[in-house]
UniProtKB/Swiss-Prot annotation:
One of its GO terms (biological process) is meiotic drive. Keywords: Membrane, Transmembrane, Transmembrane helix, Vacuole. It is a multi-pass membrane protein. The lineage of its organism: Eukaryota, Fungi, Dikarya, Ascomycota, Taphrinomycotina. It holds the Pfam family WTF. InterPro entries: WTF. It is found in: Spore membrane; Vacuole membrane. The keyword Transmembrane helix applies. Acts as a suppressor component of the dual wtf meiotic drive system, and can suppress but not confer meiotic drive by compatible poisons. Wtf meiotic drive systems promote unequal transmission of alleles from the parental zygote to progeny spores by encoding a poison and an antidote from the same locus; the poison is trans-acting and forms toxic aggregates in all spores within an ascus, wherease the antidote is spore-specific and targets aggregates for degradation by the vacuole. GO terms for cellular component: cytoplasm; endoplasmic reticulum; vacuolar membrane. This is Meiotic drive suppressor wtf5. It comes from the Eukaryota. Residues 19-30 have a biased composition (Basic and acidic residues).
Length: 269
């Protein structure tokens, strides 16, 4: 069978391809003449040259601006030694307080002191060798504690704010609630105490006995007093107290306003 395949490209497209193949890349410039046997004379932008000599762009980009962040050895030793001193300061202060620091030391005390110095020396070496590790751990711990303190403070502030709003709303809606509690308290003092005394003194004569019904009746009366005061916000007693306060305030204002009027009249005269 004959292949009847015909190219879809037009003659104009084929001429454009031939032109582009023979055109010179203006960015790279003309290709230099080189010997195919010598590898060193390959053009710099050929594929073979790129494989043999990969660009060091990543290394060159990161070669500038790099600084050595390692701390000097003297500073590391100073920080490690300071941390050991702070760790041993409470023990030294305690021995000074007991007046037992380098005083009447025996073999056991000097042995313990030598072991203590050995431990401090090993700790200094350890802290110096693992300086970056333990400093990072300390930083992370301090940051975590600061965040915990911040979250706790915010939580407590929100709790206090919510409690304040709740108390304010409670007092606004049930403004006579404190008066109800005070009335129940006074009722228990004025009625409960004489009741117990009368039962103790005249119990045998009048036949008064401590029964469950007596306690239930007293509790029910206390609850009724509380309900009678809180069933309607702004009871007569609360309104009476407000009225007395308002009248007292007006009297004070009147007493203070009279001398001012007299002083103004005298100054005008």
């Amino acid at each position: 069978m004959k292949n009847n395949y015909t190219s879809l490209k037009s003659p104009l497209d084929e001429e454009d391809e031939l032109k582009t193949d023979h055109e010179i890349d203006l960015e790279k410039g003309p290709l230099p003449e080189y010997d195919s046997e010598e590898e060193s004379t390959l053009p710099p932008y050929s594929d073979h040259a790129l494989v043999n000599n990969p660009p060091n762009t990543h290394r060159e980009n990161h070669s500038y601006g790099t600084t050595d962040n390692s701390s000097p050895l003297l500073i590391i030793l100073l920080i490690s030694f300071t941390s050991i001193i702070l760790f041993n300061a409470p023990e030294v202060c305690y021995l000074k307080y007991k007046d037992a620091f380098f005083k009447n030391y025996g073999a056991a005390e000097w042995t313990l002191f030598g072991f203590w110095c050995l431990v401090c020396t090993l700790a200094l070496i350890f802290l110096t060798y693992f300086y970056e590790t333990w400093t990072k751990a300390v930083k992370v711990t301090v940051i975590s504690l600061a965040k915990c303190v911040k979250v706790t403070a915010i939580f407590l502030a929100q709790c206090v704010k919510a409690c304040g709003k709740g108390i304010k709303h409670f007092l606004k809606k049930w403004e006579n609630m404190p008066m109800a509690f005070s009335e129940v308290f006074l009722f228990n003092i004025l009625v409960g105490s004489p009741r117990m005394n009368l039962r103790y003194i005249f119990g045998d004569r009048w036949g008064l006995k401590c029964s469950l019904a007596d306690h239930i009746i007293f509790v029910v009366l206390s609850i009724l007093v509380f309900i009678a005061e809180t069933v309607k916000p702004g009871s007569i007693r609360v309104n009476l107290i407000r009225k007395m306060g308002y009248e007292a305030k007006q009297q004070v204002n009147e007493y203070t306003a009279v001398p001012l009027r007299e002083m103004n009249s005298e100054s005008e005269a």
